[in-house]
């Protein structure tokens, strides 16, 4: 019989815990809870599991045996937090009523917290209360929601706001149910377990710390073996339940003690309310616990060690401790931007445990103990501080700052890391006290544990670290050792790694890696020395920096080791500490000059002596040390001295404020160089310093009386130079400056600290300049300090702890609050620094949150886009790699590196000759070596074009896959194979293929696929225009895959054309016409005649060749009304992944697919938007059925960008029901409509991305009722959705304007109820009064001369372009502001779009110059357009120079405008590639102007800068070919663009501003040109 543990709650043993106790559950319920009806309610996921089936079967058989007259009912609801709502509760109640359930009913809630909460609430209210049994199946439910009788549902305003206390008859925690739990849900539950131990039971917390590694290994396995941790798991659940049961028994209705269970929940619930359902409850509570623990530390109640210990424990269980953790951000995506302080505080203010609107928090006093056993009221100011990473430091208040203070800084980082290395290499047990608990030491401890270097535990509530060393017997591990930005740990472990033995169960290497900054910091000299001594170490990325791959089992040879030690003393300490374990005694000789930071080398030697190894300094050689072989013997106790570098901050505070501060445990006998700071720096600056062997006291002079130091050599204490710099900033004595030298190594720390100090001191109005090995600071009076601008982001810390702490001191001397970024970076050495500033020094501190406009979607792109990371291009020879790589490099501003050229340089001959002499096998070997080296050498700012056969070699393939795995882009380019064959057959410059080209492709096809994460298929180009279009579509593709431009979901009425063709080749020429009026175009992959990857890629190429619209990539399965087989999940997943590789803007993802498949696609989506879709093919679901809400919620929970739901209308009413549903479904953009003839109204009413058809598109089975854009607009107008509007062209003359032709043709094509007419006037006031004020149907104006400036005063707001250009050509009503008007300028768009449509590529990263000819109003728009296109310099040429001088004066300096006012100026000008002619075409051209222009045309035509034919755009559209166009094209072979194109392109933009619809390009173009 399986053992069952019973826990008493409210006086009865009703909580039963065990493993596999289904028999016990059934027996207890049927025997002790007599009923005519038992109802088991679960969710659809749980209903399919083995443990549930077992419970159900046992219940059915036992009921027949014990109570044959009773019945058993089952009901399943949809899973997920979003279904814990009123609708689902009502559906369960309706079921119970329909089944005739009465007051004696017993309900069993079998499921996670959602089921337990909601079904408990059903039981509380059904028939005014029936009995309920909780059978929790998730860890979270077992230890939290099922115990204590709290029941509830969620509302749109928050979680659990409607509910009741309703105690269950039993709670059965059967731990075997956890076998069904996904890993993330398992980990999620541990947050509540850790919380319970943290508030109540330190002994249990210690056990949990030890259990974490085993737990995580088991639950993360593909098939978790819970039996292997059965006893510990049961104990984990049991102990957590015991605490909660005790607390609930003492305070059932949560009036006092029970509030303690809400530790982490005040902040956690607020975060969850914003991030649900993407973030889980336990994840949010985990973050909440750390934030509330930091609050307790900030208030001076909780020790920094306890916070560190709690954080480490949560991380050990795989839980997040910060919203900005990489893995957590992946889950919540863009929702991260919704986590704003004001929103969180509002959520906290309506928390159920508050006293009115006063926010209450549980304050932790120690691990296992809460402060005063109750929740406390906390201020919003203190909460704001802990919730933000940016901080406002208020001016120091003389009345509040204590005159004397005693501060004990955390343990020394330098000594802490050395002690951990020595203890791990030593034998015996050592108790380390005052260890620094920071990011650096955390990484070191984790690394030592991973390498089995020592067993590590804690005592004294975490204050003492107990290390039992294994005598240097470390072994390799599978996982990479991630060291964050911990420079000390990385350098020490680099020497430890070769000593590591090989673990037969894992690999033969140790990999050391870190964050982005760590991967820039130098480690080369240390690696060189170790390699020379027999170690095998490879750089995995950038030469000279982490990550490193170190061969285990090699050891150190010993003997003489030479090391360059002028950059970092840590290199020296690293080898010193590991030297006793070399094969021979070591002589370490430091070469290259005087070693840096000699005192830190002395510190290492002194510590080695304490651990039993004596180092002797050579008497014959300078900077040389002899280290004997041996083994460290750990002392019984080792006390870490406080960090002397950190001590400089409180001492400097005293110096700056004229107060006194004592550091009681650092004095003249310190091992640390920085202990001399007070004596060598602060005393000569005017401070009174008293230093004993063990303490230091500084008393500052009165404020403003510090003296500059003409020169101080800080080489013995380089880290303290930042503190000295901020003190020197307010040390003024005439013109005397302070010069600090000996600190060159500070340029390669967490950032370039010298440059950082210069740039940030400047924000305070303090001038500083760099010296070859230091900094010079020109101090000013504190009264003259400037407050750095908060709007300009205040003080940048460069994620450097010492920069942040230093400037927190200077900030308080300003007259106003100073913003300091990234305050959490101080966690590296002093996590509680801000708490000290607040509690000890009584400094007022506020949290600060960046205004939302700074954190828009582009900020996310910058964070997660490709950035400067190099892009690797692979593909068949002849696939266009060279051309497209060149285009890509030009667009991105990258360097193009052809690996064939790199290879030829290395082998000293051309590839063809090498292959003839050495053979293909040797060539592939050399190619793989060059590839691996190049991927590291050219890791940033390059496009690497590879040879076609790079995928032939396994080693090269592994290098490519590794690059993809590390987050890089490997782009596979391909084109039609027949075209490739034709091209290659004619190419004699490259070595001949051994096989036929098609055979080669078939062999390589899968290799290309598995080695790349992106794929672009080039359509065949048969004309110059098609070639230009290919370049533009390829650039758009690159923008998408690099995150440079992310598709924006339309916010207004919009459409997409759904293509149901089997092959787009047949309709390519009609695609632009077919997609008229659409905002996107859908490729139905399942309807294609074949779904091979090549054919699907070819179809996307046809789309890109034919239209610029975003692509929606859809594969509909048979059960969802499509043609793709239902059961081919593997093939389906590959095709979905192909869509992402092809860089489509939208991917349709069916909600009925397996959950793991959905999650894999969502994880890999990159910058593609996901449309989560569900189609009710049967037509049986009405829109008030809860299943629709469940499907919508499922899409929201998955984190899709849009949700698409398709029903079938069996009656007209179904359309109205859908609109009710739409009105309540607002969490994510929704596309929802009904198919069928009776469903047409729903398509008309759908506001966003409605699918449309076209006369040329074949009808699709099951899609009856499809309409085209014009039909929808007509119907929408008829029912009042669109109303009549009037638009005008205003100015004088307007009689010949083509604008009415353009706009009216568009209205007619799209069936819009609008009219565009002419209104001739020279009076802007008349136009405003008669057209805008008096016409109730006013839609908008197109403004021409002479009103473009005069009309501006009648607008309420101007666009950026209108402001800069100083003219308006479009007026519309401001959205949502009736009677207020926006002035816009689309002339510049007409100019830039004319160039772009003609094939001019993006010029942002290309050194291209432009010229504007003329000085009128259009010239201003032309200047703006050329700047937007990316021209680096804009020249201007005009007959009347004063006019263009005026334009030059009015434009910002960054436009870089130069005037060509003489032939000499023209001769001196750089080549020009783009010209806009804005002079009248109907008058003779001035001869002098023409002479200058022709010189420009000649030079530009010869130079051909930018990789395209130089182009001239004519602004005049009459005559069709102007004299300037003729000269440019015929005489100088420039490409010319007629003015009618500019008219059309500005009109198209104007059309969209006026109507919100995409103009039908061909139709309006024809109306302007041919009518």
Swiss-Prot record:
ATP binds at residues 875-882. Residues 1059-1271 are annotated as: 3-dehydroquinase. Residues 1-380 are annotated as: 3-dehydroquinate synthase. Residues 393-843 are annotated as: EPSP synthase. Residues 1284-1571 are annotated as: Shikimate dehydrogenase. NCBIfam families: aroA, aroB, aroD, Shik-DH-AROM. This is Pentafunctional AROM polypeptide. It comes from Scheffersomyces stipitis (strain ATCC 58785 / CBS 6054 / NBRC 10063 / NRRL Y-11545). The lineage of its organism: Eukaryota, Fungi, Dikarya, Ascomycota, Saccharomycotina.
